Amino acid sequence: MICGVDEAGKGSVLGPMVVAAVGCTDMDDLIALGVADSKKLSSKSREKISADIKAQFPFSIVIRTAHDIDELRRTMTMNEIVARSHAEALIPLNCTCAYVDACDVSEERYEETVSSFSPPDCTIVARHKADSLFPPVSAASIIAKVERDRIIEELSKEYGDIGSGYPSDPVTITYLTKYIRHHNQPPVIARSSWETVKNLLHQKNQSSLLDF
């Protein structure tokens, strides 16, 4: 069986990173569902196709919470965390070949890193922009994004409007800034190891010193 792996939320400062893997014996079966790069699909299209993929193909999902990522970053780089998560998503599917989206400038180096966490009988092929090259990766990308969007929506219901969770989102930064200002610490859904959080904490501490 051939598999594809991709993640959503690697660079977000709030919420989890979601990794999905999808298996198939014939890529044309995935193409027939309308699988494409998840970024090019509307939210409704992603949700429908994600449901179709889950109903017809084997898949697995690995979720790394903000706390998980902070703990792992004590001893691993973010690329290593993603590689390990990619490998963990592949294991339940027992595939012989897996296409993964390369999270390193060097495709070969990323292949080696994922392989180091993967079963020895699974060949890893890492490519940049794999989600637009290989249907199984496109399918995994869709599932990962839909699952992450669902989680972010749930977090927003619990914590208030957190935006997309990415540092580039003004809504996310406004939420983080206000939370840190009022609580003197980041929320549990924040990745405290991120420079974004460290900078906001530093600004809060500097402001407190000036007030004093």
Curated annotation (Swiss-Prot):
The keyword Manganese applies. GO terms for molecular function: manganese ion binding; RNA binding; RNA-DNA hybrid ribonuclease activity. Its EC number is 3.1.26.4. The keyword 4Fe-4S does not apply. One of its GO terms (cellular component) is ribonuclease H2 complex. It is found in: Cytoplasm. Its main location: cytoplasm. It comes from the Archaea. Keywords: Cytoplasm, Endonuclease, Hydrolase, Manganese, Metal-binding, Nuclease. Gene3D superfamilies: Ribonuclease H-like superfamily/Ribonuclease H, Ribonuclease hii. Domain 2. GO terms for biological process: DNA replication, removal of RNA primer; mismatch repair. Its cofactor is Mn(2+); Mg(2+). Manganese or magnesium. Binds 1 divalent metal ion per monomer in the absence of substrate. May bind a second metal ion after substrate binding. Residues 1-206 form the RNase H type-2 domain. It is an enzyme of class 3 (hydrolase). It catalyses: Endonucleolytic cleavage to 5'-phosphomonoester. A divalent metal cation binds at D6, E7, D101. Belongs to the RNase HII family. Endonuclease that specifically degrades the RNA of RNA-DNA hybrids. This is Ribonuclease HII. It comes from Methanospirillum hungatei JF-1 (strain ATCC 27890 / DSM 864 / NBRC 100397 / JF-1).
